[in-house]
Every structure is written in structure tokens, then in C-alpha cells.
């Protein structure tokens, strides 16, 4: 539970700092709302985790809105999110990111579930200079491309087990430890 609270706090901080750091004149503002966009897997092979990601985004936005929103330029705004189902398809995810930016006019994106889908969307958000807070893409390669508009709340996947392995070695008196890791290569 403590880890969940920590991740939630990091997510809230990242989204608030990202939006607060950019002038509100660039934001799509509907009345007193800043509109965020997200191409996310609601169907297809990533749908289970995509729905969890959407629930997390909704929980964060609901909490921010209940706390009065975010202050930008001395004015408070609440958030609204436009979602499109990327069908767990990278090509579709990139198309929907383009649609959210060009047709819907969003100026802030919330990332999809999966490193592969994030890899498809990141070039689009970079092209249009749209900040994207990424909650679930963790492939190391995402962080070696020099993206200026991609902000992550997780450490890269290659760091997930470092602490656990160090602890296992320590508990084993420094002797070699055998481990196995299974993963999907989707990025």
C-alpha cells in the first residue's frame, strides 16, 4: 500500500509540475478545465492493464479536481480527459495521438500502457511539442532517444530488480544467486 501511495504522489506531482511549468495560454481550456488526452488500450491484448491505467488516471484527476484543481498563472483549473481506445495497436495509438492533438486540440497527453505503445506515441508528441506524462512505459530505449516532452513516473524496466537482487546477494552472504526473469518483448 505504501508503494501505491508513493507512485500516486509521484504521478500527481509530475502532472501538476508539467502543466504548471507551461503557460496556460498554450492549454486547451474549456471554461475552467484543462483538457488532457490519452490513447489507451481499452480493447486488445493490453486491455486489462489499459483499463487499470485509465482508472489510475481518473483517480488522480478526480483527486486533483476535488482539491481545487491546479493553479496556472494565478488561476485554478480542473482537469478533463479525452480517451480513445488504441486497441493495443501501436499504429492506431500514433494515429489517435495525432487526432487528440490536431483535431481535439489537447496540449497535454497521458501515456498509454506498454512501452511499445509509448514508443509509437512519443514521436508524435515530440513532433508537436506536447508534454506526455508516461505512467506505464518503462523500456530503457524510451529514455535514450533524447525526448524532451516525455516524462516518466516509473524507473526504466532494467532497474526493476536491482534492489531485490542486491538484497538476495546480501542475504546469501555474497555468494552467487541464480534468478530467472520472464518478460514480454513488446518494445
Predicted regions and their residues:
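Short amphipathic alpha-helical/adjacent loop interface patches that line ligand
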Residues: 12, 57, 61, 97
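Redox-cofactor binding/interface segments in oxidoreductases and associated redox assembly factors
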Residues: 38, 111, 181
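An alpha-beta-alpha
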Residues: 42, 148-187
Amino acid at each position: 500500500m505504501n508503494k501505491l501511495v508513493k507512485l500516486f504522489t509521484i504521478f500527481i506531482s509530475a502532472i501538476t509540475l508539467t502543466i504548471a511549468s507551461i503557460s496556460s495560454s498554450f492549454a486547451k481550456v474549456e471554461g475552467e478545465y484543462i483538457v488532457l488526452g490519452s490513447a489507451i488500450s481499452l480493447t486488445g491484448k493490453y486491455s486489462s492493464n489499459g483499463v487499470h491505467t485509465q482508472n489510475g488516471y481518473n483517480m488522480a484527476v478526480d483527486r486533483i479536481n476535488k482539491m481545487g484543481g491546479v493553479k496556472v498563472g494565478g488561476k485554478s483549473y480542473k482537469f478533463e480527459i479525452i480517451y480513445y481506445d488504441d486497441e493495443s495497436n501501436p499504429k492506431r495509438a500514433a494515429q489517435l495521438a495525432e487526432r487528440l492533438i490536431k483535431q481535439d486540440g489537447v496540449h497535454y497527453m497521458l501515456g498509454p500502457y506498454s512501452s511499445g505503445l509509448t514508443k509509437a506515441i512519443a514521436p508524435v508528441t515530440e513532433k508537436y511539442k506536447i508534454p506526455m506524462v508516461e505512467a506505464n512505459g518503462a523500456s530503457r530505449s524510451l529514455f535514450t532517444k533524447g525526448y524532451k516532452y516525455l516524462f516518466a513516473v516509473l524507473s526504466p524496466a532494467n532497474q526493476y530488480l536491482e534492489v531485490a537482487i542486491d538484497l538476495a546477494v546480501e542475504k546469501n552472504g555474497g555468494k552467487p544467486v541464480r534468478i530467472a526473469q520472464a518478460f514480454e518483448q513488446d518494445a
